[in-house]
Amino acid sequence: MNDFIFHNPDKVYFGRNQMKNLPGELLNYGRRVLLVYGGGSIKRNGLYDKVVTAVRGNGMELFELSGVEPNPRHTTANKGAAICKKEKIDVILAVGGGSTIDCAKGIAAAALTDDGDVWPLVSNGVWVTEALPVVAVLTNAATGSEMDAWCVISNMDTNEKIGLGGDALIPKAAFENPEFSFTLPAYQTACGAFDIFNHVLDNYYLAGEATFDMVLEMQEAVMRAVVKWTPVALKEPENYEARANLMWASSMALNSILDAGTVHACPCHGMEHELSAYYDITHGHGLAILTPRWLTYILNDETAPAICRLGETVFGLEKSGNVVDGAKAAIEAVSSFAFDTLGLEPSLSKLGIDETHFKAMAEHVCGESGIIGLRSLNVDDVVNIYKMCL
């Protein structure tokens, strides 16, 4: 295992009765609050009114930025940064899922730059060391942005979707009430669940470097929780235990605890970011389409043991006398989870995607060094995987 430093100062308020602590958390940073949210679901489910009452009822001034996109645009983040500069915002309150929190982080970083433009930070790979404080109220278990140091911002003019990171982007506090996810559409629940699953699988578990058993088994536990509880949440949207397990799995998957001593790889995430950048598809759905095809493509005698273990420890498959056969069964289990259990469309072509941009997408994600992971990939490999998904 590798040396590591674990640092996560995010304070999590988890459960049904934690929103009473929201005003106090915000007041730690000031009285001028920018509320950031998406398409209006928080107004329909009543959460918006609760938040506004809590903020204004405790003497704070509230400003708003609504309409954050599922793949948040740099232009939207820049609008928020302009509000922060004009209104001298003290703290940003993100209420929503990962896209909303990501956008809030982009705003937080851009607001402290001279020009208020997030894209130079993103495109130049700047590690953010100063940003406005962000407090998150989570409504969708998916990206893990509520407890990590990253955000992903899209530039639809250049067909780029790129991560921006920095310790300053870790939320100061996160409020996680599983009840806030009760009204999520089944499709969003399914896509979010696969995003969580793939965060672990893609980032660490099959990164290509062994870790120590405790961390490996923690990774497996998070993936097992997703496999176990997502069908329950889909069948019973107001099942608190199911929603709670998924919400905490979301936070655990990317808060750095599961990458202790490992390397980061993210082959599927890199490939999917290209799909989202060009075609604006839902991130978790793109991952669901890519993951079983990627596993099939990289399967050989060397990669088979790790993939076989996935089937046995996460999906409960019987031990196989032949690891290649066991790995094939594991891949089938992943595929069945994505397309049968979650009900996600397995074909890119059915989403209106053809191979027109595959070469450009592959060249961008591979860069000069290719994609690392359980098996390294070059441009031709990535194009082939995309074609397998049509």
Give residue ranges: language-model regions.
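Active-site segments that bind and position negatively charged phosphate/pyrophosphate groups
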Residues: 207-333
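Short alpha-helical scaffolding segments that buttress acidic/His motifs in well-ordered protein cores
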Residues: 197-201, 243-254, 291, 334, ...
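A glycine/threonine-rich phosphate-anchoring loop and its flanking beta-alpha core
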Residues: 10, 112-211, 305-309
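Short Gly/Thr/Asp-enriched flexible loops that form oxyanion-binding sites at enzyme active sites
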Residues: 50-51, 79-81, 100-114, 147-148
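C-terminal charged capping/lid subdomain of soluble metabolic enzymes
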Residues: 307, 314-390
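Glycine/serine-rich anion-binding loops at beta->alpha junctions
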Residues: 89-105, 139-145, 278-281
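ATP/NTP phosphate-donor binding region
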Residues: 1-91, 348
